[in-house]
Amino acid sequence: MFDSCRRDIHYLRLSVIDRCNLRCRYCMPDGAKILEHEEVLTHEEFLRLAALFAQCGIDTVRVTGGEPLVRKSVAQLVAGLKATPGIRHVSMTTNGTLLAQQLPALLDAGLDSVNISLDTLDPAVFRHITARDEFASVQAGLRAALESPLPVKLNCVPQVGVNEGELEAIAALARDNDLQVRFIEMMPIGYGAAMPCVSGPELRARFANRWPELHPVEGTTFGNGPAVYYTVPGWKGSIGFIAAVHGKFCASCNRVRLTSQGFLRPCLASETGCDLRALLRGGADDARLRTAIRETIWSKPREHHFEDRCMPATRSMYRIGG
């Protein structure tokens, strides 16, 4: 369906859990408050809402967290989403630590693609960022994904003074692998709001200096997102840039977000939205829920104001769905 700005909203980011087995410094550091189990939607509630979203025009769902693979029987939820009439594509964003062992079940469930978050190729830096010694597990998950039939993307958040020196090495993973390596600007939300941002344009210029033949990939977007892709002659994969702060792409935004608590956010940066869990558990029928979904999508803000770096400190990416 269309929002009030005539944008075609057909993509739902579905945060199925706020918990995570890593403690990334910009997302969910040690001490972050987690929800009680009863506060999180059940599989049945997620699937009921997914069917209603599909009836409102959503055809693409990305399963996120927290870390979605921490959720018990998440492959069953993926299978349920794939079986929902109207939903044609189901993908997942994961930190990769549990992916190697769960990938067979996810493939059986019909998962269409996977994004893996990895900010470093150095085990010591990985521990600094995540406060956990799980680098080998992520490597295993990435290898398993690349050996599977799934399209794979790797998400990296450049961090000043942390992983700046290895960004070329991370980008070069696309040289020998059929892989889209995307560099995502630090979101000025929650814990990340206090951290300096490496801008997408700055990084693109740096890579162009390293690889003078770097050029835009024409004719494909590798999915439904805002990344702008580049490649180098002879490379198997490509490099993507998602510059939410320094390259605002709100005019073409096609998505909304449902948190694990059932709160529908029409915009990552907005405080507005609708508590669908309250309606669900309050006995609302499908017609009432569809109306709430449509009204919330219609009210999607024209644009964010990340450039002002004024997001409330109480907001956290692991709660919203990163």
What is each model feature region?
Residues 1-11, 175-176, 186-322:
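Auxiliary Fe-S-binding modules of radical SAM enzymes
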Residues 4-44:
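Canonical Radical SAM [4Fe-4S] cluster-binding loop centered on the CxxxCxxC motif
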Residues 16, 20, 24, 63, ...:
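Conserved, mostly hydrophobic/aromatic
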Residues 16, 35, 67-71, 159-163, ...:
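Short, small-residue-enriched loops and turns at beta-alpha junctions
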Residues 22, 123-124, 248, 274:
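Glycine-centered loop/turn positions within well-structured domains
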Residues 23, 27, 71, 124, ...:
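Residues that scaffold the ATP/ADP-binding catalytic core of kinase and kinase-like folds
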Residues 32-36, 122-129, 190-194, 275-277:
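A short acidic, helix-capping loop that chelates divalent metal ions and anchors anionic groups
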Residues 40-63, 70-184:
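Radical SAM/AdoMet-radical enzyme domain recognition
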